[in-house]
């Protein structure tokens, strides 16, 4: 079981997002979907529910409501958390990296 989420460095999280996530995701309201869905408003949203993006059945049926902890659990190993996800990213194994990234995402994805 992944470690509990603890707020981290927003600045380091922004760098992680830029180097690990930005090639597939956008965060701004009304931003386009890329390989992955736009993440604006992801927190408090149910998995697989952004209109205009084609999710796998696995993501839709996982029925998770995203919060900091569920996002941390997912980002540690996406294919283990949701077998059948099409997210190619292998995950962030370091707890600190996940905490930093999620701290950034909580602000950037509002």
From Swiss-Prot:
Binding positions (heme c): 21, 24-25, 87
GO cellular component, one term: mitochondrial intermembrane space
Principal location: mitochondrion
Post-translational modification: Binds 1 heme c group covalently per subunit.
One of the GO biological process terms: mitochondrial electron transport, cytochrome c to oxygen
Keywords for the protein's UniProt record, in alphabetical order: Electron transport, Heme, Iron, Metal-binding, Methylation, Mitochondrion, Respiratory chain, Transport
Classification via InterPro entries: Cyt_c-like_dom, Cyt_c-like_dom_sf, Cyt_c_1A/1B
Residue positions, PTM N6,N6,N6-trimethyllysine: 79
Domain of life of the source: Eukaryota
Subcellular location: Mitochondrion intermembrane space
MF terms in GO: electron transfer activity; heme binding; metal ion binding
The family this protein is said to belong to: Belongs to the cytochrome c family.
Role of this protein: Electron carrier protein. The oxidized form of the cytochrome c heme group can accept an electron from the heme group of the cytochrome c1 subunit of cytochrome reductase. Cytochrome c then transfers this electron to the cytochrome oxidase complex, the final protein carrier in the mitochondrial electron-transport chain.
Protein name: Cytochrome c
Record gene name: CYC1
